[in-house]
C-alpha cells in the first residue's frame, strides 16, 4: 500500500526512507510493496527481498479497504505495515501503522470539510483495528490521545532522520554551484515553506505553514536593524501564494523565492545560511528542523508541536503566533556570531540522536513482537494510505 511513497513531501520521504531501512536491516524477510502505479517500482528492484505489486485504482478508499487486503490474502502476507495512518478494516491480517499527524483535530480550518469528516470517522476505527501503533513524535501522540480514544497499544516513537547530504561538512564546490544556480546572497536567513496540501493536488492552498505571519515578522525585523539579511524561501508556489493574499512587491522586499529545491542543493543552502527560521503553527515532527541542525545551521523553531521535542535546547524557540517574538529571534540570532556558533555546535550534537536506522530498528522490533520470527522469515507488506 505504498501509494504515498512518490509524494514530493515529508510523508513521501518518510515512507521511502523507512522502507529502505527495513529492507536493509531485514534481508531474510520477503517484503511486498503495494503501489498504485509502477512510477517508482524500479527503485526497489535492487533489493532481493523486495517484491512490488501494482494495483491500479482511482479510489483510495477502495484501494485501501478492498483491493490491497484481497491481494495481501492471495499472496500470503503475515503482517501489514502502513507508514501513514490507514489499515484494511475487514482484513484478518494483523496490521501496524504510524500516526503521522493530528493537525486535522488541532487546526481543522486547514482542511476541507470532507477531509475532516473522513479523518474523524475513520482514524478512530484505524486506531481500534491496529494490533500496534507507532507515532512520529511524542507530542503528536499526546495531542491525538487527548482528542480520540486510542485502544491499540502504542509501542514506540519512530522519529525521522536525515540523509548523508545533510552534514556540517559542506562541499565548497557544491555550495558554489548552489549559490550560482539560485543567485544566493553572501549572507541570508533561510526558511522552508509549504503552501500545498500533501497528497491532494486538487485541494486549495494549505494555510498551516503560517507564511503570512512569518513575512510580516520579517518586515518588523527589517525595520529594527540597519543591516537586514535577505530572507531566502525554499518551497513550491510560495510567491504565488503570498501575492494572492495581497503581499505587494514592497512588502516582499528582501525576500528571495527559490521554488522547489532538491535535497542536495537544500543541504548546501542550510550550510551557507546565517540561520534557519521555521514558524509553522504545528509540526508533527519537523524534518526541516533536523536538517538545519544536522548541517550546523542555527535554528529558530516553533515552541508548539514537536519543535521543542526535536530541537531540545539547541534552537531558539519562538511563539509562531507572535510576529514580535519571531522578529526578536531573528534580530538576536543574526546579530551575534557567538550565539550562532553555540547554536550550530549544539544543533549538530542534537541531530545525532536521530537516524533512519533507529526508526527501522524500532519498527522491526514491533514486527517481532506481533509475529515471532517476523524479522527472519515472515512476509510483511509496507503500506501507505490516506
Region roles according to the model:
Residues 1-386:
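Carbohydrate transferase catalytic cores enriched for Leloir-type hexosyltransferases
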Amino acid at each position: 500500500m505504498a501509494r504515498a511513497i512518490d509524494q514530493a513531501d515529508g510523508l513521501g520521504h518518510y515512507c521511502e526512507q523507512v522502507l529502505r531501512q527495513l529492507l536493509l536491516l531485514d534481508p531474510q524477510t520477503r517484503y511486498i510493496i503495494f503501489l498504485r502505479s509502477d512510477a517508482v517500482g524500479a527503485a526497489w528492484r535492487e533489493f532481493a527481498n523486495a517484491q512490488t505489486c501494482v494495483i491500479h485504482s482511482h479510489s483510495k478508499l477502495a484501494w485501501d479497504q478492498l483491493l490491497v487486503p484481497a491481494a495481501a490474502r492471495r499472496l500470503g502476507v503475515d503482517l501489514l505495515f502502513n507508514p501513514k495512518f490507514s489499515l484494511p478494516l475487514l482484513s484478518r491480517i494483523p496490521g501496524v501503522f504510524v500516526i503521522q499527524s493530528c493537525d486535522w483535530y488541532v487546526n481543522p480550518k486547514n482542511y476541507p470539510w470532507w477531509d475532516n469528516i473522513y479523518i474523524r470517522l475513520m482514524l478512530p476505527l484505524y486506531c481500534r483495528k491496529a494490533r500496534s501503533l507507532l507515532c512520529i513524535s511524542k507530542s503528536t501522540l499526546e495531542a491525538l490521545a487527548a482528542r480520540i480514544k486510542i485502544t491499540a497499544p502504542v509501542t514506540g516513537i519512530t522519529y525521522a532522520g536525515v540523509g548523508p547530504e545533510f552534514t556540517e561538512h559542506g562541499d565548497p564546490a557544491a555550495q558554489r554551484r548552489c549559490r550560482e544556480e539560485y543567485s544566493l546572497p553572501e549572507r541570508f536567513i533561510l526558511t522552508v515553506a509549504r503552501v500545498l496540501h500533501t497528497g491532494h493536488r486538487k485541494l486549495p492552498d494549505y494555510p498551516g505553514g503560517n507564511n503570512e505571519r512569518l513575512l510580516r515578522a520579517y518586515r518588523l525585523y527589517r525595520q529594527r536593524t540597519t543591516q537586514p539579511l535577505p530572507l531566502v524561501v525554499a518551497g513550491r508556489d510560495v510567491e504565488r501564494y503570498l501575492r494572492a493574499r495581497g503581499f505587494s512587491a514592497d512588502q516582499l522586499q528582501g525576500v528571495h523565492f527559490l521554488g522547489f529545491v532538491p535535497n542536495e542543493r537544500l543541504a548546501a543552502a542550510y550550510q551557507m545560511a546565517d540561520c534557519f527560521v521555521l514558524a509553522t503553527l504545528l509540526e508533527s515532527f519537523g524534518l526541516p528542523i533536523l536538517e538545519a541542525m544536522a548541517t550546523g545551521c542555527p535554528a529558530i523553531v516553533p515552541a508548539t508541536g514537536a519543535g521543542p521535542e526535536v530541537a531540545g535546547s539547541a534552537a531558539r524557540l519562538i511563539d509562531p503566533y507572535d510576529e514580535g517574538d519571531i522578529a526578536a529571534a531573528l534580530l538576536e540570532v543574526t546579530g551575534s556570531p557567538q550565539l550562532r556558533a553555540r547554536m550550530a555546535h549544539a544543533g549538530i550534537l542534537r541531530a545525532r540522536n536521530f537516524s533512519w536506522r533507529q526508526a527501522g530498528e524500532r519498527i522491526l522490533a514491533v514486527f517481532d513482537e506481533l509475529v515471532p520470527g517476523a524479522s527472519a522469515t515472515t512476509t510483511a507488506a509496507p503500506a501507505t494510505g490516506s
